[in-house]
Amino acid sequence: MASPAGTHSLPSYLDPNHLGPWGVYLQQVDRVTPYLGSLARWVETLKRPKRALIVDVPIEMDNGTIAHFEGYRVQHNLSRGPGKGGVRFHQDVTLSEVMALSAWMSIKNAAVNVPYGGAKGGIRVDPKKLSRSELERLTRRYTSEIGIIIGPSKDIPAPDVNTNAQVMAWMMDTYSQNVGATSTGVVTGKPVDLGGSLGRVEATGRGVFTVGCEAARLTGMAIEGARVAVQGFGNVGGTAGKLFAEAGAKVVAVQDHTGSIHNAKGLDVPALLAHVQQTGGVGGFAGADAMANDEFWGVACDILIPAALESQITQDNAGKIQAKMVIEGANGPTTPEADDILHDKGVLVVPDVIANAGGVTVSYFEWVQDFSSFFWTEEEINARLVRIMKEAFAGVWQVAQDNKVSLRTATFIVACKRMLHAREMRGLYP
């Protein structure tokens, strides 16, 4: 039976009650719809990905067997420009997760006003169980499979969980071999020698630090002496922790996959970073006391930075949080239920879609540099990153004040209006 005129037939996996990250995203869009004015008539376009590609990724293993892995590339919204978003290799990757991450990339790119739409990719695999040659074959096969929808003017992948500059180099080379010409701009996060940008590795953490300082300034919190707790101590959490420590804050607790550590007087961050580099995690660091993982969330601190995976702050642990401010370095680390709890507690949440946009901002710089074949100094890159992040945060802060809403809702209002205005101006074709 056909749907009545004016209604939308919604596939089951797009239902707002859908469990998982995509359901979280749909709830977030529903929260901002009342603030969109006449643009709300287009809001349904934000609740559906433009396209979702599921691919089989078969590779020959080192022992001669053939293994099959499931891969994804989702393009959520391309109204403002080509798709942009990372590729993650993780055993728990799902379509719901990749769809949500692509949508959050749409929001993030629009929030900082870089000319991209949102996209995301992933392979359901534990890369730690692969040899280097198996990882390379997996990357190249996946790149070939999604090659029909990526390109420097179509969709530009980047590193994410368990992917790095080497993986991006393999992706760039595979795409280039397939099209018959070197195309450095097809991915970002590449090695500098292959058209990568200076400052890219630290960019997300630097963005977290920048908006954190702006939020602290606007709320009257002094960074000097502030106690900081960080979950995840890789490129994002490690860089943010280092910059906060250099600004006079005390990093008092850190958690990662190897355990949780605490030192109320402040951790020696350079020594901890060296320990992580040598051992692969914070566990066993001599300059701190070990603590139970569930105790990490209740540690006495002023600023909490979740910089690991999504859905880490939930209704089960949000009530324990003592921080005055949460700066989301990870994508989607706070569930909607936890968001409400933190709001009721008076905790300021600086959301992922603005806080961790430093990475995609410098990816944009890399893309621009690749097209022009003219490269900037690290000082130029960092200065431009800080300017864009400060301007974007100031705009979001003003919308939050004007509408008396959270920073997350304000970021979504800014981003959704930009995307839907672009969609309205472009119209529908045919």
What are these regions (language model features)?
Residues 1-198, 421:
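N-terminal ligand-binding/catalytic initiation module
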Residues 12-20, 36, 215-216, 319-430:
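Adenosine-phosphate binding glycine-rich loop
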Residues 20, 24-27, 93-96, 130-141, ...:
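Conserved active-site and cofactor/substrate-binding residues in soluble primary-metabolism enzymes
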Residues 259-349:
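Rossmann-like adenosine-cofactor binding region
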Residues 191, 196-300:
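Glycine-rich phosphate/diphosphate-binding loop of Rossmann-like nucleotide-binding domains
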Residues 98-101, 171, 208-216, 240, ...:
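Buried hydrophobic packing segments
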Residues 100, 156-158, 181-187, 230, ...:
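General beta-strand structural signal in soluble alpha/beta enzymes
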